[in-house]
């Protein structure tokens, strides 16, 4: 059994589906509530909930989790004489609930088969699969086959952002910048507009000039990567603070918490967040892996944070 002790505790969700195809007369019995054993949809929902809760008992290497929510939907599809079952499972933990969602769908479908087999044992179960999951290091995943033709509006639509890589070696063309492009791709996925992406050496004056230029260009979000460690030239946090920026302590705490699943060295990082002239300035570590985990942590926080920085009332902002 995999040790998940070092993984970060995050909110995790999963959504799965499956279907059962019935003979026409059996389909009619189910949809009209004419089964001798009771309401087929209600019993399938109960079975699905039980399936999610007992997943760790069925699968030997699956971690037992404190399930916080299970929702089972049964959708009759008259054209194909099928019942589509969808399960949504939610928890806050160190590992995902994909198997719980799949187990819930399977249990609900098996319950429907059990309720109807006396009329027709040839009912067919199929299409069981994961639709979507969120949480953890990998963030949001959606099964490609069901991805919408038009991408939904990203969480940072309309936000102007700047990416600043802080590295002596990258600035001198002695190393490849991996974290900067990673942040840019993430911002693009969130529908943000990238005003500038630049690289500067580990010089406080250069860091400050890049930040001030970003603010002058109207960037509401300024993401820096690098210069947050214990090295003699790691001075990104000091450069930001010396501009008169107001610290947001929880950001650094959350970034280190998110990175602890990657390495214990995350506790040596001095990454953090600041408010400066109406912009949100966030200093991420230089490691691309730490950047990935940090961005996953920031994703649900940024829309609310940026709205509040613009003067929105707390009660009118979701999240």
Swiss-Prot record:
Show the taxonomic lineage.
Bacteria, Bacillati, Cyanobacteriota, Cyanophyceae, Synechococcales
The protein, known as: Molybdenum cofactor biosynthesis bifunctional protein
Q: Does the keyword Lyase apply?
A: yes
CDD domains noted in UniProt: MoaC_PE, MogA_MoaB
Gene name as annotated = moaCB
Origin species:
Synechococcus elongatus (strain ATCC 33912 / PCC 7942 / FACHB-805) (Anacystis nidulans R2)
Task: List its EC numbers.
Answer: 4.6.1.17
The family this protein is said to belong to: In the N-terminal section; belongs to the MoaC family. In the C-terminal section; belongs to the MoaB/Mog family.
Q: Which UniProt keywords apply?
A: Lyase, Molybdenum cofactor biosynthesis
Q: Which Pfam families match?
A: MoaC, MoCF_biosynth
What are the recorded Gene Ontology BP terms? Mo-molybdopterin cofactor biosynthetic process
Q: What reaction does this enzyme carry out catalytically?
A: (8S)-3',8-cyclo-7,8-dihydroguanosine 5'-triphosphate = cyclic pyranopterin phosphate + diphosphate
């Amino acid at each position: 059994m995999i040790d998940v002790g070092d993984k970060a505790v995050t909110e995790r969700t999963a959504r799965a589906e499956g279907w059962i195809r019935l003979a026409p007369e059996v389909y009619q019995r189910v949809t009209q509530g004419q089964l001798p054993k009771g309401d087929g949809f209600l019993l399938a929902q109960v079975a699905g909930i039980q399936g999610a809760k007992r997943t760790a008992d069925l699968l030997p290497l699956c971690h037992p989790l404190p399930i916080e929510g299970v929702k089972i939907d049964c959708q009759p599809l008259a054209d194909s004489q099928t019942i589509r079952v969808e399960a949504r499972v939610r928890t806050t933990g160190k590992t995902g609930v994909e198997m719980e969602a799949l187990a819930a769908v399977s249990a609900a479908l098996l319950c429907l088969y059990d309720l109807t087999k006396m009329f027709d044992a040839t009912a067919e179960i199929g299409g069981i699969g994961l639709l979507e999951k969120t949480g953890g290091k990998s963030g949001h995943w959606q099964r490609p086959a069901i991805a919408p033709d038009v991408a939904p509006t990203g969480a940072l639509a309309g936000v102007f952002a700047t990416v600043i890589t802080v590295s002596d070696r990258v600035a001198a063309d002695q190393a490849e910048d991996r974290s900067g492009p990673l942040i840019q791709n993430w911002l693009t996925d969130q529908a943000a507009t990238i005003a500038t992406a630049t690289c500067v050496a580990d010089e406080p004056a250069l860091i400050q000039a890049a930040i001030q230029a970003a603010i002058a260009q109207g960037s509401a979000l300024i993401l820096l990567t690098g210069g947050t460690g214990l090295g003699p030239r790691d001075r990104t946090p000091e450069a930001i603070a010396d501009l008169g920026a107001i610290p947001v302590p929880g950001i650094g705490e959350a970034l280190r918490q998110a990175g602890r699943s990657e390495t214990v060295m995350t506790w040596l990082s001095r990454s953090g967040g600041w408010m400066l002239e109406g912009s949100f300035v966030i200093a991420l570590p230089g490691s691309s892996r730490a950047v990935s985990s940090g961005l996953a942590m920031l994703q649900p926080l940024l829309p609310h944070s940026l709205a509040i920085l613009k003067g929105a009332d707390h009660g009118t902002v979701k999240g």
